[in-house]
């Protein structure tokens, strides 16, 4: 049944993406020439394993302190010095890795396509514990409050002890028969664990007992076919202050209160990539490849960039006062946060950048589907004031 489920998910993902890409044209938008208005430098770059399969695997980059951690689907796990890219240690697992790493509390957590949750020491990569949740893992874990919180593709959210991996609690959400291939990454905020699910809901549970604190419907099902009714919340729920922000495929982007899950505002917008926020705006990479800024307070659309349509954008990040997205050709795009104007491009390879970029101090870490890991630096944004 698991194999059938995975095949259906992959087929649905391909069909849904194809539908999104063929609304206006079959090919990605052609980039028009651009003279860079800011100076972007590659500080260091390295290769992590070989090219990954063309699947939405949850492999990415994790940072804790001055260390950077990365992994390949073939089981390679590596640690680097953040500032220089110097290799600190590396190990090889005999397991097909599909999610992680996640870093926190001295631990490094990885997930496998067979449902293994594997804990390592950040210091030297020595093994700590290993358990199996009997479900494929497609998103990195969350670490906090003495827990490792893991989401499986079967709709279960597991709260594992960070000490030995024993299960403290498990929460089960009903999973639709068909869904996009991918799962929302859980997050731990205060005494709550937050996660989105394939049924369009965002769930908050207490980290102590796993009791549901609240759940909110971000996706709303419409249409007559199962494809039209896909409403997965695959993007990570973003926490900022007392606010939460979530977005669903073929659904809505919403601002919620962290304490109760009450929806403050919601706007129709489709995304499975994700969003970023700052003090004024909410930035979303849509399923069609637009980049949209919404007013943080009201949800009103403030600008929309359409020149990157069908370029399979990554989730946006806010880095040094600007909005950054990456695309299918290994190109990283810098946008003006206030206007959406394109400021600069920087190539880090020729392969898609599917995994979320990571802001680490004054560096931006970019991990391509071919395993190329790059640390970039751009100058801080300086606002001008009228005289």
Model-identified regions with their sequence ranges:
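Sec-dependent bacterial lipoprotein signal peptides
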Residues: 1-21
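Bacterial Sec signal peptide processing site at the extreme N-terminus
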Residues: 15-37
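Extracytoplasmic beta-rich repeat domains
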Residues: 25, 37-62, 89-104, 127-144, ...
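Short loop/turn segments that connect beta-strands within beta-propeller blades
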Residues: 81-84, 121-124, 161-164, 207-210, ...
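Structural signature of WD-repeat beta-propellers
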Residues: 72, 112, 152-153, 197-198, ...
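Loop/turn-rich, solvent-exposed surfaces of beta-rich toroidal or solenoidal domains
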Residues: 283-293, 300-334
